[in-house]
Regions:
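Extended, folded cores of ATP/NTP-driven motor/assembly subunits in large transport
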Residues: 1-279, 283-286
Length: 286
């Protein structure tokens, strides 16, 4: 069983502000982006705490071979994973996404990371995993797993320093689980968002950071739909694609690996998000 942390140990880092979007670009919950993949999430408002900004960084992580383990190995994996979660003093979330993939572009971008000697083993391993998944034949769907870390800091440079500080420790913890983390830059994160907003049109994604800076383009226009209609029980997006959101209000004390495996291995696009909060330490309060 995968034991979930007690609810009372989680406290939101900032008071959530729900704003009615005035245009379709406002539905994207991101304020500013940096080339290295660090995103600022909320635009400062008159009601927000002065000098505090919310930033996050996203990583791809490799599968933990959990479903094939015996009971003793599962208990050990769960113990390690719980230790990992409790060691984090920032908010984080785990996202499992079944999406259509522009396979050639995706492989090319992952392999580009092998240019760095530090990232070469991770890039090659993930490239191998992508190939195996595509060979499984799930209607052209690729499953990606993301680990997103958030923090509150007074400015971008402080957030960058913080993420660089904790990144090695997080990667080591995932390595102990038999997994690995690959940090995503801005282009890769936008591609992941594009695969949701423009589902079925993944090959059309095009984003160039230098062009974005030179022309001062709105990056939101590169990923968002041209239309989004709210219906009573679903959202209707461009091209007739429909989506609905289901919220699990209360989890049991534990979830079996079989339940999670069946939930996230559907033969249609699905995004599963597990959002957890931890109380930030005084040092992390900025």
């Amino acid at each position: 069983m995968l034991k979930l942390l007690k609810k009372e140990t989680h406290t939101p880092q900032t008071e959530r502000i729900y704003k009615v979007p005035l245009c379709i670009q406002d539905t994207i919950p991101i304020y500013r982006i940096a080339e290295n993949g660090i995103f600022e999430l909320e635009k400062p408002t008159s009601g927000s705490k002065k000098g505090i900004h919310q930033f996050d960084r996203m990583y791809l992580f490799e599968d933990i071979n959990f479903s094939t383990q015996d009971e003793e190995e599962k208990e050990d994996t769960c113990s390690k994973f719980e230790t990992l979660l409790r060691s984090m003093n920032v908010s984080y979330k785990i996202i499992v996404s079944n999406h259509y993939a522009d396979n050639n572009k995706l492989r090319e971008e992952i392999l580009q990371k092998a240019v760095s000697k530090e990232m070469e083993p991770l890039a090659k391993e993930y490239h191998k995993m992508i190939g195996e998944r595509l060979e499984e034949g799930r209607g052209g769907l690729l499953q990606s797993k993301y680990f997103v870390v958030s923090c509150r800091k007074p400015d971008y440079e402080s957030a960058k320093t913080y993420f660089n500080t904790i990144e090695f420790s997080i990667q080591q913890l995932f390595h102990r689980l038999g997994s690995c983390l690959i940090p995503l830059d801005a282009t890769e994160r936008l591609r992941a968002l594009h695969s949701y907003y423009r589902m079925g049109d993944e090959a059309s994604f095009s984003f160039d950071w230098n062009e974005y800076l030179h022309l001062k383009r709105d990056w939101r226009n590169d990923i968002i739909n041209t239309s989004l209609r709210e219906r009573p029980e679903h959202l209707e997006m461009e091209g007739g694609t429909c989506a609905c959101v289901m919220f699990v209000r209360k989890y049991p004390n534990g979830l079996t690996d079989q339940f999670l495996n069946e939930l996230t291995n559907m033969n249609f696009p699905i995004i599963y998000t597990c959002l957890l909060y931890t109380s930030p330490s005084p040092r992390d309060r900025g």
